[in-house]
Amino acid sequence: MSGRGKGGKGLGKGGAKRHRKILRDNIQGITKPAIRRLARRGGVKRISGLIYEDVRAVLKSFLESVIRDAVTYTEHAKRKTVTSLDVVYALKRQGRTLYGFGG
């Protein structure tokens, strides 16, 4: 594995390393109308203005735990791509079985 850089597989010189932009405060991308639509789907009629930040915080913690478990499944399988089955198994582990995506 000498001289192959970070990837470890393949031949050739290798391309430029990809750098991801560090994303901060993306939770604000969950807009007020998006939260309102989700609440409507759940049968909510009126929504207090103080709810939106709390919903964002709860959603962030929920997604962090699901993504952490899904990435754990991915790393255990020695893959770099998170599949839908990884997410299904992560949700099942947390007691939220999701049907329709295999598994």
Swiss-Prot record:
Modified residues (N6-methyllysine): K6, K9, K13
Biased amino acid composition, Gly residues: 1-14
A single GO BP: nucleosome assembly
InterPro entries assigned to the protein according to its UniProt record, in alphabetical order: CENP-T/H4_C, Histone-fold, Histone_H4, Histone_H4_CS
GO molecular function, one term: protein heterodimerization activity
DNA-binding region residue numbers: 17-21
A GO cellular component entry from the record: nucleosome
Keyword DNA-binding: yes
Residue numbers of N6-acetyl-N6-methyllysine PTMs: K6, K13
Main location: nucleus
Subcellular location: Nucleus; Chromosome
Protein modification: Glutarylation at Lys-92 (H4K91glu) destabilizes nucleosomes by promoting dissociation of the H2A-H2B dimers from nucleosomes.
Listed CDD domains: HFD_H4
Residues modified as N6-glutaryllysine: K92
Region (Disordered) residue spans: 1-20
UniProt keywords, alphabetically: Acetylation, Chromosome, DNA-binding, Methylation, Nucleosome core, Nucleus
Oligomeric form and interacting partners: The nucleosome is a histone octamer containing two molecules each of H2A, H2B, H3 and H4 assembled in one H3-H4 heterotetramer and two H2A-H2B heterodimers. The octamer wraps approximately 147 bp of DNA.
PANTHER family in alphabetical order: HISTONE H4
Role according to the record: Core component of nucleosome. Nucleosomes wrap and compact DNA into chromatin, limiting DNA accessibility to the cellular machineries which require DNA as a template. Histones thereby play a central role in transcription regulation, DNA repair, DNA replication and chromosomal stability. DNA accessibility is regulated via a complex set of post-translational modifications of histones, also called histone code, and nucleosome remodeling.
Similarity-based family: Belongs to the histone H4 family.
Protein name as it appears in the record: Histone H4.1
Natural source organism: Eremothecium gossypii (strain ATCC 10895 / CBS 109.51 / FGSC 9923 / NRRL Y-1056)
